[in-house]
């Protein structure tokens, strides 16, 4: 399993909307990808209130894929590309991390 996390900070205004509206639109557009992309096991989207803290993101994506191949297929999927183009227009920053989780790993064995 591959976990894919992305955090965005958004522009105050973009695409004719304020930041709060664009946050909601991103959430809706990402959630609409559920069931469209093979290998996408889980997708959650969170939006932050109205923080001006420069260290805090505005939108976070947490997703799980069956494999790296599935993650690559997601990246090139036409439905994802449409959402990504919108996000690129309204985001000012993006941070991403992808990491592999093995079945043998469990919360009780997590490093401290």
Model-derived features: positions:
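C-terminal structural segments of small proteins and small subunits
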Residues: 68-97
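Short S/T/G/P-rich N-terminal loop/turn motif that feeds into the first structured element of a domain
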Residues: 1-57, 66-73, 99-112
